[in-house]
């Protein structure tokens, strides 16, 4: 009997089958999500958070903090001209801020001049500087985007000026020119810099700020350049690709509270460096009204009324028990009797104070706050009231 080999077992046929199989495998779709993160950085973000920003470009740190393997983060960083001009001012000197400013300038130069791409498998970078081609609006047009006019009392410690804006100012203690001249000569440059700064509560500048706390604050002039750039990126520029939700819109990263308040008054979301890091790696925006939960799904809807951390209880609304309402216990001895260990009246008085709750009279009082715009409710420490507890048997471990 002869052995007949089928033509299907030829070498050519095996090669064709392998080609077909490889073609089928390559046709399987691979779902890779892409997420846009758009950040505008001012000089304080670099000066106070240069270490955080540099590790955004560190491969090891990225791999240890990203939670999704099938996601690519497109990190867009925009550096306005305002930031570069502030670098020129801050970098002078030997302070830590000056050192960090020079380090930030070197970091930006190395990125822009580096021929090797710094993109990783999980993050694609796009660092750009503000250019003359950007159609930045004039300041008069920017006023159309203003949503709030902040007052002096909205700023921390009523401080509305940058420290550098106070250089060269001297107090008007005396109109005598000879006094002012001698006074200026007796002070160093740094001392003159801090004369009109709000240092402590009893200072004249602090008391003056409280007296005028209801007046509208005045924006530092040079801050307008930053606000203009932010308005252009957030409201005017055509975004490519288009934003999917509010989280992907441009946000200002700053560590300065004055800048933050003014930026928010023009509808610009603000983050600090740590909050920006949450947005990059965890896709969490602190400007949204939800609590950060790394184990929750992005599709979960947050309801503040169902979360205990969002609820507040005013314990002063509950009734206080008076002395007459407190029943006398069987082991109570009169204050003239001696108790165990031969304790006299002093010990009984101490136990009596601990036993009886304070009277409801003058337990809660309301006073005006320092700014005079509202009231604060005070409760005596010894009469702190608690919300009523539910009924039932307390569980105890076996």
Swiss-Prot record:
It comes from the Eukaryota. One of its GO terms (cellular component) is cytoplasm. The keyword ATP-binding does not apply. Residues 335-350 have a biased composition (Basic residues). Signal peptide: none annotated. Residues 327-355 are annotated as: Disordered. Involved in nonsense-mediated decay of mRNAs containing premature stop codons. This is Nonsense-mediated decay protein 4. It is found in: Cytoplasm. One of its GO terms (biological process) is nuclear-transcribed mRNA catabolic process, nonsense-mediated decay. Keywords: Cytoplasm, Nonsense-mediated mRNA decay. Coiled coil: none annotated.
């Amino acid at each position: 009997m002869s052995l007949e080999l089928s033509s299907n077992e030829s070498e050519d046929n095996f090669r064709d089958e392998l080609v077909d199989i490889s073609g089928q495998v390559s046709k399987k779709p691979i779902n890779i999500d892409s997420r846009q993160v758009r950040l505008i950085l001012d000089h304080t973000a670099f000066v106070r958070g240069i270490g955080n920003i540099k590790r955004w470009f560190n491969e090891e740190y990225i791999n240890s903090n990203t939670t999704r393997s099938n996601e690519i983060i497109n990190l867009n960083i925009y550096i306005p001209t305002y930031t570069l001009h502030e670098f020129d001012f801050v970098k002078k000197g030997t302070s830590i801020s000056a050192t960090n400013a020079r380090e930030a300038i070197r970091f930006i130069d190395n990125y822009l001049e580096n021929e090797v791409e710094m993109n990783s498998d999980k993050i694609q970078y796009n660092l750009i500087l503000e250019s003359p081609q950007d159609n930045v609006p004039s300041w008069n047009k920017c006023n159309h985007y203003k949503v709030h006019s902040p007052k002096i009392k909205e700023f921390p410690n009523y401080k509305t000026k940058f420290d550098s804006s106070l250089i060269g100012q001297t107090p008007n203690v005396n109109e005598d020119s000879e006094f002012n001249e001698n006074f200026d000569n007796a002070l160093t440059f740094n001392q003159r810099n801090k004369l009109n700064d709000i240092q402590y509560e009893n200072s004249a500048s602090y008391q003056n700020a409280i007296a005028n706390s209801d007046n509208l604050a005045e924006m530092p002039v040079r801050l307008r350049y930053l606000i203009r750039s932010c308005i252009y990126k957030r409201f005017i520029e055509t975004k490519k690709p288009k934003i999917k939700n509010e989280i992907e819109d441009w946000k200002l990263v700053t560590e300065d509270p004055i800048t933050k308040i003014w930026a928010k008054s023009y509808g610009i979301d603000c983050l600090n460096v740590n909050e920006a890091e949450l947005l990059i790696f965890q896709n969490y925006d602190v400007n949204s009204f939800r609590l950060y939960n790394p184990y929750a799904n992005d599709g979960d809807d947050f309801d503040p009324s169902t979360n205990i951390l969002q609820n507040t209880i005013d314990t002063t609304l509950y009734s206080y028990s008076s002395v007459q309402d407190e029943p006398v216990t069987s082991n109570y001895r009169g204050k003239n009797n001696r108790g165990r260990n031969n304790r006299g009246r002093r010990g009984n008085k101490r136990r009596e104070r601990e036993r009886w709750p304070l009277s409801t009279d003058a337990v809660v009082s309301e006073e005006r706050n320092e700014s005079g715009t509202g009231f604060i409710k005070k409760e005596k420490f010894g009469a702190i009231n608690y919300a009523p507890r539910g009924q039932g048997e307390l569980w105890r471990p076996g």
